[in-house]
From Swiss-Prot:
Catalyzes the condensation of (S)-aspartate-beta-semialdehyde [(S)-ASA] and pyruvate to 4-hydroxy-tetrahydrodipicolinate (HTPA). Signal peptide: none annotated. This is 4-hydroxy-tetrahydrodipicolinate synthase. GO terms for cellular component: cytosol. It comes from Ruthia magnifica subsp. Calyptogena magnifica. The active site is at Y138 (proton donor/acceptor), K166 (schiff-base intermediate with substrate). The record marks T49, Y112 as: Part of a proton relay during catalysis. NCBIfam families: dapA. The gene is dapA. Its EC number is 4.3.3.7.
């Protein structure tokens, strides 16, 4: 079956808030979920790249997803990030996400071991066949060192519970090819804040956004205008965020977004090694962006 809940528009790639010692701050997590519900965010991705999935162990990974689902209390869909570079581990994470009530799962391509296209196809196929939950592919070759080719996505799109893809290549030609060639009920999400509005105007269904952690109302409005094919309003709403979109990636995500949210008073300044607190030079740039937007 195709998806039966409304995963379109602005989907936040939520941070995992931490105390200064790196332990998880579940109190702040609860407040962030409420913040997004109140701000018009359409869904939350829990434990993705922005959520520091790489530095949390598997028990913590599941506990953060479980808490996010509990705090949401069915008021907003929760997409659990359950990808891994081991197919068996991805299956176990996806099974756990289904049991605790996730609405869908986001599965990054296996990283580091660099599978072939056939290996990628078999990886996703087995997960989909093993766990009956809606699944979204996630292609981010800049991080994984492997690119999920359009032809492989087309093959995977024929599997019933693979419902869409997050394309974080930032290449609108790739987006165009995907949108033109896949079935109408296959969902396309931008994973690149800088090009997300244009991606949606081309026929995408939404964006999984880092910037939405800071400006959820503006991102939600820009994406909604784009979904309505109102280019002028979509672009004018998004334009003030252009510098922020860029500077949130001046160092590796989620370093800049976590510092920006700390500066806003939304969370503590905790982050886990090997990631470190944002450098002073980058802090000055982001602080100027936040000031220009009237956030601080």
């Amino acid at each position: 079956m195709r998806i039966n809940h409304p995963l379109t528009g602005s989907i936040v790639a939520l941070i995992t808030p931490m105390f200064d010692d790196g332990s998880i701050d579940f109190g702040v997590l609860k407040s962030l979920v409420a913040f997004h519900i109140d701000s018009g965010t359409k869904a939350i991705v829990s434990m993705g790249t922005t959520g520091e999935s790489a530095t949390l162990n598997q028990d913590e990974h599941i506990e953060v997803i479980r808490a996010t689902i509990e705090f949401a209390n069915s008021r907003i869909p929760i997409i659990a990030s359950t990808g891994a570079n081991s197919t068996s581990e991805a299956i176990e994470l996806t099974k756990a996400a289904k049991v605790i009530g996730a609405d869908a799962c986001l599965l990054v391509t296996p990283y580091y071991n660099r599978p072939t296209q056939e290996g990628l196809y078999q990886h996703y196929k087995l997960i989909a066949e093993t766990v009956d939950i809606d699944q979204i592919l996630y292609n981010v070759p800049s991080r994984t060192a492997v690119d999920l080719c359009v032809e492989t996505v087309l093959r995977l799109s024929n599997i019933d519970n693979i419902i869409g893809i997050k394309d974080a290549t930032g290449d609108l030609n790739v987006a165009k090819a995907l949108i033109e060639q896949c079935a109408d009920d296959f969902l396309f999400y931008s994973g690149d804040d800088a090009t997300a509005v244009e991606f949606i105007l081309m026929g995408g269904h939404g964006g999984i956004s880092v910037t939405a952690n800071i400006t959820p109302k503006q991102v939600a409005s820009a994406y909604q205008f784009a979904l309505e094919n109102d280019r002028e309003l979509a672009e004018s709403t998004n334009a003030p965020l252009a510098d922020l979109h860029q500077h949130l990636f001046i160092e590796s995500n989620p370093i800049p977004i976590k510092w920006a949210m700390f500066k806003m008073g939304k969370c503590n300044n905790g982050i886990r090694l090997p990631l470190m607190i944002l450098s002073q030079q980058a802090q000055a740039m982001l602080e100027q962006d936040l000031s220009n937007l009237g956030i601080i």
